[in-house]
Amino acid sequence: PAWSSDAAEAAGPVSIVTVLSPDSEDIQTWLDGAPFAIQRDQNGTGDAVAAARDVVGGDDGIAIIMFADTPLVTASSLTALADCVAAGAAIAIAGFEPADPTGYGRLVPDEDGGINRIVEHKDATEKERRIALCNGGIMAVRTPALFAWLSRITNDNAKGEYYLTDIVELALADGQQVRHVVIAEEEVMGVNDRLDLARAEAALQSRLRIAAMEGGVTMTAPETVFLSADAVIERDAIIEPHVVIGAGCNIGEGSMIRSFSHLEGARLGACCMIGPYARLRPGTEADEGVKIGNFVETKNTRLGAGAKANHLTYLGDAEI
């Protein structure tokens, strides 16, 4: 859930609680002491959120409920949902407008622009199926009201599960206002298989490339460049086609990474020239003006200002 939790953290909540299944020891270890709750039985989304009650405690702020398998959600969208509740809505729901809404639940509006109900596609009337606004599944609710409504929902449905979306009907019955915030369709894309994973990776890579170019980095064929999310590339750097910049890299101002180079854990000063066909492995440090040429591999090596390794070389555990 790293991408989702990173977005939540950037949105500024006081606490992030992850709801897990009982057989989630690996994820619990990965959380490294961060709060989590266990949903003992898989009894629906409402039951999953209710499982966090004891961990959340008496918090009287705003709860944002999101899915760990939607890595493309942004902090700005989560903030917009929280702001909607802070402005007076009892519940704020993320909505999106896909090119083809078939199969998605619809957010049925009322006359005042609020949400009257959520209806699944299979249960929708022909008129409701013409509604473009679909349920993104992410919502913000004031915490005390959230758990009060969850205590009132039932599992009287075909699946015998407790649905989080049932709190909308309860809120409206209590005379409360339910609003929506429109977000991009890609933000609610779930990752359920390897095909979804590839699509999500492509979308995230596009975001990383755009951010780098907006920061002053030149990419001559950006669709062929692959970046780690933690890579730092300073302005006026030039990245040629078919380059991989992996985890832990820092590329200095004005440096050039030429085609078919692969970097991981490397730190480059300003105006370095890397590649083509160079491989920089973890522990590589290059000061200003270093040249590492074609078919050169480095690991745990420091190259001082102006040093050159032009071609066909392995440098390991060295200082040049």
Question: Where would I find each of the regions flagged by the language model?
Answer:
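Conserved N-terminal catalytic core of the sugar/cofactor nucleotidyltransferase
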Residues: 1-83
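Catalytic cores of nucleotide-enabled group-transfer and carboxylate-activating enzymes in metabolic
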Residues: 7, 15, 30, 53-54, ...
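Short, high-confidence coil segments that cap the C-terminus of an alpha-helix
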Residues: 13, 60, 87-91, 176
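Conserved beta-strand segments of alpha/beta enzyme cores
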Residues: 15, 35, 114, 177-179, ...
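Structural beta-sheet core signal
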Residues: 18, 64-65, 91-94, 180
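Conserved core of the sugar-phosphate nucleotidyltransferase
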Residues: 25, 29, 73-158, 165
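Short glycine-enriched loop/turn motifs at secondary-structure junctions
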Residues: 66, 130-134, 181-184
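Left-handed beta-helix
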Residues: 156-320
